[in-house]
Amino acid sequence: MAPTEQPVRTFRFERDTFAFPHELVWQYHFDPVTGTMTTFNSNPPPTYYHRCFVMVRSTRQFFYHARFAPELPPVAPEACQRIIREVVSRNPRRACAESERVMVPGYDGLRSFSRAHEPLLKAEMGGAWQSYFLRSHWRMVFPVHRWQQKRMGEKLKQSLPQRGLSLVHLFRFPRITINHGIVLYGLAESEQNLEFEAYDPNIPEHPVKLVYERKRRVFTFAPSRYWGGGVLSVVEIFCDWPY
């Protein structure tokens, strides 16, 4: 594990997440009796999609490398473009020193900044290909065993306080019913579960929860507009080699 060496700030959902959603290519319907999933094209068609991993990576880059200064006046769009390019060019695995952070004047966090500059952020954070070509994607094609998920749960429990937020890949394979990235930023622990509080780029309105069940040694994710709920595989990404 290679956690950040810099002091970790507290991540706040209402301040440190994007105001706009990652859009769905399809709309999903889940049969309440059988659980069968059917899909149909979104109407109107989405304009910002296949970038969930771009968004979770960028969330961390702003958390690790930006310093928001609401007391200063906002700058022109051209300057905002330079700010965004600088932040998303930084290392998503390690925070910089406080003195090296990129100043973002006029806003108190990523949510207010992204509300004001949505088109710029979408244009500059990276294309859909960056969601497909992640060095960690090799892991999803190999079996994920319960003992490995137990280790992953404990790893996330240990690393989250050091990193400030952890990025994870949620998937089912070989039948790909989910292939998605979210941001973990909080943890509630009991004898039965590790309950991670998370930001889902598909659902910017409120936090979601990813649960590790100790008895079954599995991760579960609640039903949503794009996932029927249940057990899935979890791998931490943008962390240590080879992820």
Region spans (language model):
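Active-site-adjacent substructure of cysteine-protease-like catalytic cores
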Residues: 144-189
